[in-house]
Amino acid sequence: MAYPVQLGFQDAASPIMEELLYFHDHTLMIVFLISSLVLYIISLMLTTKLMHTSTMDAQEVETVWTILPAIILILIALPSLRILYMMDEITTPSLTLKTMGHQWYWSYEYTDYEDLSFDSYMVPSSDLKPGELRLLEVDNRIVLPTELSIRMLISSEDVLHSWAVPSLGVKTDAIPGRLNQATLMTSRPGIYYGQCSEICGANHSFMPIVLELVPLKHFEEWLLSMF
């Protein structure tokens, strides 16, 4: 989860998020090197008084500054495409969770089980218990098993929403009349927080998401308690 005055990403809790963090560091290093080179060239231009008045063209330099950016773009594009394909890859899911966005709450349906669905509203600040997080707690948490592939089906009943959980590297738009799909998998039990990430009206800021990821045995016990 996030911490006060945090500048970096949240800790990765899924393989996809780990790949995204590696790609971010890879791209940031390239940007840093290019920025340093540009600043160095600018500083040379500002501090030197030498000028090559007889130089009309420099084909070697033009060749280098055409080929080098192309190579850099390829070094950025290939890892990016790899992660995009990983995010869209759908294996045989062990569980399917249907998510519907509303103004301004979420509803969830475990489609593999009959009559297992509920709405999830934000807990008002006046009802929070000690240790609970303001604007992030909900009355009904999503409970999911760890180490299993979970398919998320995401849509909306009214306007555009976006179902996002940063620690899991998931952000999928909820669009009325359209069913989007995402895959979740994590080996780390815990409670993970997210929020609606698409401006959807007056109470957009009050649509938190809470996932409680537990071992399979505890998930089965939770299922029995829901019937």
Swiss-Prot record:
The keyword Chloroplast does not apply. Cu cation A1 binds at residues 161, 196, 200, 207. It is a multi-pass membrane protein. Its EC number is 7.1.1.9. Residues 46-59 are mitochondrial matrix. Component of the cytochrome c oxidase (complex IV, CIV), a multisubunit enzyme composed of 14 subunits. The complex is composed of a catalytic core of 3 subunits MT-CO1, MT-CO2 and MT-CO3, encoded in the mitochondrial DNA, and 11 supernumerary subunits COX4I, COX5A, COX5B, COX6A, COX6B, COX6C, COX7A, COX7B, COX7C, COX8 and NDUFA4, which are encoded in the nuclear genome. Component of the cytochrome c oxidase, the last enzyme in the mitochondrial electron transport chain which drives oxidative phosphorylation. The respiratory chain contains 3 multisubunit complexes succinate dehydrogenase (complex II, CII), ubiquinol-cytochrome c oxidoreductase (cytochrome b-c1 complex, complex III, CIII) and cytochrome c oxidase (complex IV, CIV), that cooperate to transfer electrons derived from NADH and succinate to molecular oxygen, creating an electrochemical gradient over the inner membrane that drives transmembrane transport and the ATP synthase. Belongs to the cytochrome c oxidase subunit 2 family. This is Cytochrome c oxidase subunit 2.
